[in-house]
Amino acid sequence: MKVIDLNCDMGESFGHYKIGCDEEVINYISSANIACGFHAGDPQVMDYTVKLARDNKVGVGAHPGFNDLQGFGRRKIHMTGEEIVNELIYQIGAIRSFCEANGVGLSHVKPHGALNNMASVDENLARAVAKAIKLTDPNLIYIALAGSKMEQIGREEGLKVAKEAFADRQYNPDGTLVSRQEAGAVLHDKETIIERVVQMASEGVVTAKDGTKLNINPDTICVHGDNPEAVELAASIRHMLQEHGITVKSLGTWFTG
């Protein structure tokens, strides 16, 4: 039986600002990556989102990013390895405390935005992220872009690394994600996205923008839930996976690394 995890970034509202359709998308995913207050989120949102995941039996993960609320963590910030380690320990610790307060276990860590993109190709950054996870809790699952420096370094550090693919993002031939600043970086056609996800989950393959077939064999696939159309898309993705005999389950219930 083929098993896959569907993850989604959540808890990215802040104060009076409402971002995402968390309450709707939660019905179709198996893991929630919850913002930790640096690129998005605040204590009230973090607590609410942990409860939302718990009540819907969805796995909870930390989604740490650069300290950049205005840029939503999508702008590059150059920091020392020590600074990265400490900022991630701080953020992971925050969401883990909310998990403990609500009787939930923290299952994984997935870096956000620019930090995720930079660490995917920068060995020193990737090692800093892995070190922060290892120092916080070496049993946490490290969600890393399939084929990236994060995956490589995470394994070298002895962490449980779950390979990630993105449902609605275009890929470069080297396996990195096409920059959001480029046209066509984010896919919008529903049928195309669903077809790609099924191919990822069943065959372990994704087609890059030049037609290259990339062997990624993902353990988890990221779906986005930041607009009403995304809710319908997430529902369709889950339904189609099940139609192809693929079971959707949170990483913490089956993944061993």
Curated annotation (Swiss-Prot):
Q: Which domain of life is it from?
A: Bacteria
GO MF assignments: 5-oxoprolinase (ATP-hydrolyzing) activity; ATP binding
Gene behind the chain? pxpA
Q: What does this protein do?
A: Catalyzes the cleavage of 5-oxoproline to form L-glutamate coupled to the hydrolysis of ATP to ADP and inorganic phosphate.
The name this protein carries in UniProt is 5-oxoprolinase subunit A
Enzyme class, broadest EC rank: hydrolase
Q: Which PANTHER family match?
A: 5-OXOPROLINASE SUBUNIT A, UNCHARACTERIZED PROTEIN YBGL-RELATED
**GO biological process: any one?**
carbohydrate metabolic process
Q: Which reaction does it catalyse?
A: 5-oxo-L-proline + ATP + 2 H2O = L-glutamate + ADP + phosphate + H(+)
